[in-house]
From Swiss-Prot:
Superkingdom of the organism of origin: Eukaryota
Enzyme category, top tier: translocase
Organism in which the protein naturally occurs: Carica papaya
Keywords: ATP synthesis, ATP-binding, CF(1), Chloroplast, Hydrogen ion transport, Ion transport, Membrane, Nucleotide-binding, Plastid, Thylakoid, Translocase, Transport
Pfam family for this entry, one: ATP-synt_ab
Residues the record lists as binding ATP: 170-177
Entry protein name: ATP synthase subunit alpha, chloroplastic
E.C. number: 7.1.2.2
Family from the record: Belongs to the ATPase alpha/beta chains family.
GO cellular component, one term: chloroplast thylakoid membrane
HAMAP family named among the record's database cross-references: ATP_synth_alpha_bact (MF_01346)
UniProt GO molecular function: ADP binding; ATP binding; proton-transporting ATP synthase activity, rotational mechanism
Function recorded in the entry: Produces ATP from ADP in the presence of a proton gradient across the membrane. The alpha chain is a regulatory subunit.
Reactions catalysed according to its record: ATP + H2O + 4 H(+)(in) = ADP + phosphate + 5 H(+)(out)
Amino acid sequence: MVTIRADEISNIIRERIEQYNREVKVVTIGTVLQVGDGIARIYGLDEVMAGELVEFEEGTIGIALNLESNNVGVVLMGDGLMIQEGSSVKATGKIAQIPVSEAYLGRVINALAKPIDGRGEISASESRLIESPAPGIISRRSVYEPLQTGLIAIDSMIPIGRGQRELIIGDRQTGKTAVATDTILNQQGQNVICVYVAIGQKASSVAQVVTTLQERGAMDYTIVVAETADSPATLQYLAPYTGAALAEFFMYLKQHTLIIYDDPSKQAQAYRQMSLLLRRPPGREAYPGDVFYLHSRLLERAAKLSSQLGEGSMTALPIVETQSGDVSAYIPTNVISITDGQIFLSADLFNAGIRPAINVGISVSRVGSAAQIKAMKQVAGKLKLELAQFAELEAFAQFASDLDKATQNQLARGQRLRELLKQSQSAPLTVEEQIMTIYTGTNGYLDSLEIGQVRKFLVELRTYLKTNKPQFQEIISSTKTFTEEAETILKEAIQEQMERFLLQE
């Protein structure tokens, strides 16, 4: 027979009393009124805050965006197919944040910073808010270091500095993403962390970019944030902010970062969809009234930090697609007014075989020569002037049949300079190679060659200079100026290579 021992029972009761933790948990709960199209209307949740995360019964997370008198409009971060009318929703008391760490380098993730490349979880000890305020005026300093893209046309005439925001704009299929990926490839060995954000792109296009980066070893210093065209609008809207939060993490660790948004007009479309479904009043082109703020708060996060904060930087390259060259549409004009310049890619130039198809005439960089090394400033000024004069002459020459010798020479020089700006995709040039190429063109060394021979000669000259006269590269990389000694070495190399080239031909 079982005996009941009073002392044992009293010990158990005493232990339980000691372990008793009096905790009152207050949870704000609401009820789903209606759900559909990625939007849920919720009754209750009286104390929910704008932008707060809410959790549905079946695990889906949403963001409270519309706080109305009798209900709350929530956008869903998922398909929400299992959410039922009448089910309960609880407020989490948090706003959207993501884990951040150096382990993200080389990975492909979604807008919630979850890996989507099938290579396992990513460990992270810290987290950052997806939407954090941009650095203030005192926290910044003016842009003064170059961020080399490896493209002659950009680095010589539309230079980009670390901490700048430069828009890449053009019609579809004009090589916008190619300019951005070439810039990532050119950061190899430059100690720059790159973040590529694909918003509403085809999954095949994103896969192609990732493959290119992997083949060239660029994924070692790159993070890809992808929300493809089949993702919910909420996640497409959040993806750029996730990318910015990751880039900021490295920026505040005194590192240089480059972030590419491809493209913010898709983000604006996702935001328009959410806003219209939430019954917010539509404005121009049916976009909501705060679509400017959508992009300005994102792009203002790019900065060159002051010396007190470690001089880290975040350079932003947003890519905007235009419809048949219409730069005056709503989103393009918004982004142009926020950024520090734009690189305009033209379909006509692309079809004429001028690639990268950069229209140098209407592309600008508002940072200008502050973002160039001295050596580049010394050779690039002449190039821009000669190309501008050539463009003017070319338009005039179409109507005039008999041109004097000087005009003919200027046209011939201009055609060779245009040839010199052409580059193959995924073949960025070092700054020393660019300086050598520009000097050769602007000083008339290419004038004696046929237009078709220019590129071949330049490729051979670069190889010849690298193998036979390595001191040229050493002078420019150490002094950052185009010294008389460097000029003498370059002139010798050009003459020697020209003799060899003409013998071959």
